[in-house]
């Protein structure tokens, strides 16, 4: 990453995948029966309730990540990226290895979530229901006028790339120049009571945001 525009583009990509992953989790949650009113026994109703609670916690984490990515973008003078494609998402919008579709709650959906959230460097296979035969690669050649999409292995890989961009631009431009957005325009914890929401004012707080 050599320009502010390239960093903004990468943050928009991070926002889009967090938004889409969140939608997948929410769809899985709302596909579950609501309890005894939907014909479940009392025992199974409690089990389903615990599944919903666990999935909701994960979806809320995605909401936090989306909010923090918005704050990262705002901090460098851009606007939060909140648009996303409709489902089904066409090939090429995300890297080849990232398949995002709306599936009801199942073992496959759980395995898919684990695959999407896996740490960088961990080798896991996606659930077979989400693996599609595709053959495309997104590359971003140097020297182009406009930023373009490029591939990444994991969401953590994407954030690592963005943090390298923050570090490089902070060094080349200076933090005062890079972090030109007003903190008043960011989403504060008082406005979005999500766990881990914080504002970004400099390189140190930017580096903490992806780990929240």
Where are these regions (language model features)?
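Non-heme di-metal
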Residues: 1-212
């Amino acid at each position: 990453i050599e320009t502010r525009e390239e960093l903004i583009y990468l943050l928009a990509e991070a926002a889009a995948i967090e938004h889409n992953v969140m939608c997948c989790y929410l769809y899985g949650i709302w596909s579950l029966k609501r309890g005894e009113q939907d014909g479940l026994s009392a025992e199974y109703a409690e089990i389903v309730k615990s599944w919903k609670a666990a999935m909701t916690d994960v979806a809320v984490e995605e909401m936090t990540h989306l909010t923090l990515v918005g704050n990262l973008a705002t901090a460098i003078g851009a606007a939060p990226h909140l648009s996303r494609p409709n489902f089904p998402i066409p090939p090429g919008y995300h890297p080849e290895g990232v398949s995002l579709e709306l599936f009801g709650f199942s073992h496959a959906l759980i395995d898919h979530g684990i695959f999407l959230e896996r740490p960088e460097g961990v080798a896991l296979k996606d659930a077979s229901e989400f693996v599609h035969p595709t053959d495309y690669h997104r590359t971003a050649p140097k020297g182009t006028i406009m930023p373009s999409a490029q591939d990444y292995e994991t969401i953590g890989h994407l954030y690592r790339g963005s943090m390298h961009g923050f570090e490089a631009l902070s060094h080349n431009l200076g933090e005062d120049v890079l972090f030109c957005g007003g903190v008043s325009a960011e989403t504060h914890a008082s406005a979005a009571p999500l766990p881990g929401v914080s504002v970004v004012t400099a390189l140190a707080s930017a580096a903490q945001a992806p780990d929240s």
